Amino acid sequence: MSETATWQPSASIPNLLKRAAIMTEIRRFFADRGVLEVETPCMSQATVTDIHLVPFETRFVGPGHSQGMNLYMMTSPEYHMKRLLAAGCGPVYQLCRSFRNEEMGRHHNPEFTMLEWYRPHYDMYRLMNEVDDLLQQVLDCAGAETLSYQQVFQRHLEIDPLSADKTQLREAAAKLDLSNVADTEEDRDTLLQLLFAFGVEPHIGKDRPTFVYHFPASQASLAQISTEDHRVAERFEVYYKGIELANGFHELTDAREQQQRFDQDNRKRAARGLPQQPIDTNLLEALKAGLPDSSGVALGVDRLVMLALGAEQLADVIAFTVDRA
């Protein structure tokens, strides 16, 4: 295919047929387990406050909104799905398009397919087992390795991420030739994320998926803090063959705590010169009404298909990447 033939799909037709078969397999996996498939909006009047996520923004002009209504393309269906949980839907999953106004590359496209599911009355470990079941079925891979965030840092960087101060983190970064970035970085979590990306990720999940759990409490996002160790959050991520596949939580159910985290995110945004984002008050009201104790996970389907097909890049498994859209 010539570089100028941008009307043509980026993925081959055989790969698209294989992708369709995997989507069918995913739906069968959840149907067999009695999990309800749902659809939720791709746009919302609120968006994520996470400082690392950049949503697309658009404007609706119509009856009653002559001045326009700001809308955000969803970076994940999480907030709407939690509202369904609070309404009593039971176990639920969704295959949907998600949007992030960020990078494009081998493992990234600003529009992508997300698999997200929630399990009432599951703890983090039980959900991790179900994710492992899905990966073994779709990827025909070995069962996953499970390590704590603390363990992977101690194994690959010889430091304790839960107790190390910023000086120690910068010293670890220097060993990875990252001093040019680390020496001027004052945020401890950014230093940890830098070390994880360059000092841990390249070494895990090579032969089988690796689950990393109990991230620092400061990186809890929408996860609960562990009752056994308040230094860590009940959050996990999944890595395989150099790719981050999934991110899961034992979900936070406390509306007041969630409000505080949203506010803290917006303060961090202001300090970095980033726009503060509108908080999803409907989610907070759902939490107040009562979200059942649940665990949930978001998994990148395009990356999953790429691994299943042994493809080199997302473009090989997406019909039209953004440069051909």
Swiss-Prot record:
UniProt GO MF annotations: acid-ammonia (or amide) ligase activity; ATP binding; lysine-tRNA ligase activity; tRNA binding
Catalytic reaction(s) noted: D-beta-lysine + L-lysyl-[protein] + ATP = N(6)-((3R)-3,6-diaminohexanoyl)-L-lysyl-[protein] + AMP + diphosphate + H(+)
GO biological process: lysyl-tRNA aminoacylation
Record flagged with keyword Ligase: yes
Keyword field contains Nucleotide-binding: yes
EC identifiers of the protein: 6.3.2.-
Positions bound to substrate: S76, P77, E78, Y118, E251
Function description: With EpmB is involved in the beta-lysylation step of the post-translational modification of translation elongation factor P (EF-P). Catalyzes the ATP-dependent activation of (R)-beta-lysine produced by EpmB, forming a lysyl-adenylate, from which the beta-lysyl moiety is then transferred to the epsilon-amino group of a conserved specific lysine residue in EF-P.
Cited HAMAP family: EF_P_modif_A
Protein's name in the database: Elongation factor P--(R)-beta-lysine ligase
Organism: Enterobacter sp. (strain 638)
Lineage: Bacteria, Pseudomonadati, Pseudomonadota, Gammaproteobacteria, Enterobacterales
Gene name for this UniProt entry: epmA
